[in-house]
């Protein structure tokens, strides 16, 4: 038997994990084992919301060392994380300033300023990326305007996964899929857009040309002295998750469900027309030159904050209590900027309901019901937008990532969207990370080849839409009201 041992470092906004994958060539089987799991979260430092990258690096090294201590020969390592955030370095490779998180308020008002000065359509035509107030372009503008004293010291700007790869190897890399989240990469050249960079205030010399997934960045020297290749995987965690989504045919959509929910479809060409701009659709880079045409949805961040504020530890019990409540009594827009990082999420949700003359969710279960129903309805709206954009309906939706373990939300999504939902794999980002490593090691041919492996090894659960559910009736009522308004217009 021929085995490959690959390690995936998968960092999310709320947690990180070091996972060991064992691939058996002859039977094309893939097994995952969690080596080390650790918490991640936001910190307040010198007036900014930041990431503790030193603690994260220590946790990564601890996980890698644990694998080596077991006597396992690692064939390769890959790192994926969230997008848009970065670390600044000087000529000696030392950090400059703080690793500020995207939920910090320093970018307030800058997106509108960019649209006014550069033109919203021109920015979109250049980047193809959705307008979000925390995109890297606005973070860099905030940095250069608010902390000009740092500029003379900056030699390099590395996105988060590239920074950790640099810390392991001493080699710098700017991986393409994550680079596209910055709104600074030109969609036609796959290189940094000089006009957008100029507006951000950043120096182009801070960046190297983006590289597509599949190259070896450098080597990590393990405690036993072995040189282990560190591969540039699809380092944006959603890009990795999409690679591991067992999409079957052109009518399949995906939803990567976690702190963020990202819903979209794969395409060989980007969509940057006026319809896409009006819908605020993003065209993020994917593996093998594919585009991830998708939309960002605030996701389970709202629930995570409620769990924290209410000190709820038993999520299954909460979901069971939530399921017993009637649907669609409390509806909010999860994508409202007010929910990006409020002082108190529970109070913010209640205020949104109060301002729209709805009942106020008071109990833990009512708050969760509000979040689940609102997300499912937003999923239905976004799926409809995506279908209109490409001119073809979807036949199934693949929900991947940690959020796919929420059976209630999966069923609500199926009912609201009126579409078959296939949930799994849970560790999609980790699997996609491993997939690129196996391709780099010449064990697999391409993404489609890897998806066949995922389909036969992952635990998948199907949810069939129930047209008689409360949320399905609510959606039908909304559509009927919209059609009436359109006819009367």
From Swiss-Prot:
Keywords linked to the UniProt accession: ATP-binding, Disulfide bond, Kinase, Magnesium, Nucleotide-binding, Rhamnose metabolism, Transferase
Covalent S-S links between cysteines: 68-222, 353-370, 413-417
Pfam families (UniProt xref): FGGY_C, FGGY_N
GO CC annotation, single: cytosol
Active site positions, chain numbering: 237
Entry's EC annotation: 2.7.1.5
InterPro entries (alphabetical): ATPase_NBD, FGGY_C, FGGY_N, Rhamnulokinase
SUPFAM superfamilies per record: Actin-like ATPase domain (SSF53067)
Pathway stated in the Swiss-Prot or TrEMBL entry: Carbohydrate degradation; L-rhamnose degradation; glycerone phosphate from L-rhamnose: step 2/3
The UniProt record lists the keyword Amino-acid biosynthesis: no
Cofactor dependency: Mg(2+)
Role summary: Involved in the catabolism of L-rhamnose (6-deoxy-L-mannose). Catalyzes the transfer of the gamma-phosphate group from ATP to the 1-hydroxyl group of L-rhamnulose to yield L-rhamnulose 1-phosphate.
Record-stated family: Belongs to the rhamnulokinase family.
Protein name from the UniProt record: Rhamnulokinase
